[in-house]
């Protein structure tokens, strides 16, 4: 809803700015809007496929923070900020600020005030915070019943219904034909497919990888009516992680059963990994749960020697 006023508008000017030290944007007003993403996103992809804007931006410029501001003429100005916080691209648009404020007012009643606590003094510049509701409301807890996606269903999708040779050893079943190979582990219910025809051609170009994997996964029904969303990207290997969401919130699992990991090649899937467990029935629970206070969570994180906050960019 918030991006709707920005769609299909013209970009009047583009400016690329780099800072070797802390990033400063002197033109910012005090009432800007901030969008944070959990992953790096190519600016050209976001402008073209999300906002439907045409703009000549730096090649392969990725960002994970978008600042929405306005200039003296009341035009919306976008600042796409790089993950390392040294670069930003400034785009001045033809969208008027009052149109954006109207959209903001429409959703504000559904928004919940949050407060933040910095987790570690050494990470202030990287804006590593814990966010929690200022006035927490009661939320439901859920228990889920899982069932298993059939291996045959995944094979039909990834092998394109071609003839498959099957072999089994020590709880691992291997399926292959002349273009690909897949392994299924009975114990952890993990499925791993590799496209042999793309063996030398994995892509790390996010401008191609993100649209390709998104269209593939949604197009073939691999989500099976579950809510999976792009959650993280690896710019070196090109691997994308799609995470299962429930009621708008991300789910987490130590064994990775809540994720699909996929890498794109020149013409299609290069590598595809996922658990074949899926949520079947969600059970409401009326049990009361006592959650720890925000400060105790912050303290536990800051004093946990197993967490290296130099490598943490989003909480």
What is the predicted role of each segment?
Residues 55-56, 62-90, 210, 214, ...:
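Zymogen propeptides/activation segments of proteases
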Residues 1-205:
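Preferential activation on post-signal-peptide N-terminal prodomains/segments
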Residues 89, 252-253, 279-287:
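A short, polar/proline- and glycine-enriched secondary-structure boundary/capping micro-motif
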Residues 10, 145-154, 198-236, 282-314:
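Short, non-transmembrane alpha-helical segments in secretory-pathway proteins
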């Amino acid at each position: 809803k918030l991006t709707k006023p920005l769609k299909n508008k013209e970009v009047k000017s583009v400016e690329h700015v780099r800072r070797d030290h802390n990033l400063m944007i002197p033109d910012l007003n005090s009432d800007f809007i901030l969008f944070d993403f959990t992953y790096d996103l190519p600016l050209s992809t976001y402008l073209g496929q999300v906002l439907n804007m045409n703009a000549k931006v730096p090649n392969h410029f990725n960002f994970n923070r978008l600042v929405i501001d306005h200039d003296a003429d009341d035009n919306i100005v976008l600042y796409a900020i790089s993950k390392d916080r040294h670069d930003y691209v400034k785009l001045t648009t033809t969208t008027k600020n009052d149109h954006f404020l109207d959209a903001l007012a429409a959703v504000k009643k559904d928004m919940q005030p949050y407060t933040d606590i910095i987790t570690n003094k050494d990470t202030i510049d990287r804006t590593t915070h814990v966010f929690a509701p200022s006035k927490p409301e009661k939320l439901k807890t859920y228990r889920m019943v899982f069932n298993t996606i059939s291996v045959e269903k995944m094979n039909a999708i990834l092998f394109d219904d071609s003839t498959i040779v099957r072999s089994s050893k020590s709880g691992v079943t291997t399926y292959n034909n002349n273009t690909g190979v897949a392994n299924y582990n009975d114990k952890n219910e993990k499925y791993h497919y590799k496209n042999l025809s793309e063996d030398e051609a994995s892509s790390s170009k996010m401008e191609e990888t993100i649209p390709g994997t998104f269209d593939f996964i949604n197009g073939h029904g691999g989500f099976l009516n579950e809510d999976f969303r792009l959650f993280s990207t690896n710019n070196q290997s090109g691997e994308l992680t799609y995470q299962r969401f429930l009621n708008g919130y991300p789910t987490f699992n130590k064994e990775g059963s809540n994720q699909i990991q996929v890498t794109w090649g020149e013409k299609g899937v290069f590598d595809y990994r996922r658990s074949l467990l899926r949520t079947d029935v969600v059970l409401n629970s009326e049990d009361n749960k006592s959650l720890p206070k925000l400060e105790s969570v912050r303290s536990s994180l800051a004093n946990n020697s197993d967490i290296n906050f130099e490598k943490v960019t989003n909480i």
